[in-house]
Amino acid sequence: FLPLLAGLAANFLPKIFCKITKKC
């Protein structure tokens, strides 16, 4: 469960960071 969650976060967080900071 945790490795899956970590993988999901690693894929999801950069997209949020990109939207917030406008840096992609």
UniProtKB/Swiss-Prot annotation:
Keyword line: Antibiotic, Antimicrobial, Secreted
Known function: Antimicrobial peptide active against the Gram-positive bacterium S.aureus (MIC=12.5 uM) and against the Gram-negative bacteria E.coli (MIC=25 uM).
Tissues in which the protein is found: Expressed by the skin glands.
Provenance organism: Odorrana grahami
Stated family: Belongs to the frog skin active peptide (FSAP) family. Brevinin subfamily.
GO biological process: defense response to Gram-negative bacterium; defense response to Gram-positive bacterium; killing of cells of another organism
Main location: secreted
Coiled coil stretches, renumbered: none
Subcellular localization(s) per the UniProt record: Secreted
InterPro entries tied to this protein: Antimicrobial_frog_1 (IPR012520)
One term under GO cellular component: extracellular region
Domain of life: Eukaryota
Protein's name in the database: Brevinin-1GRa
Keyword check for Secreted: yes
Pfam families, alphabetized: Antimicrobial_1
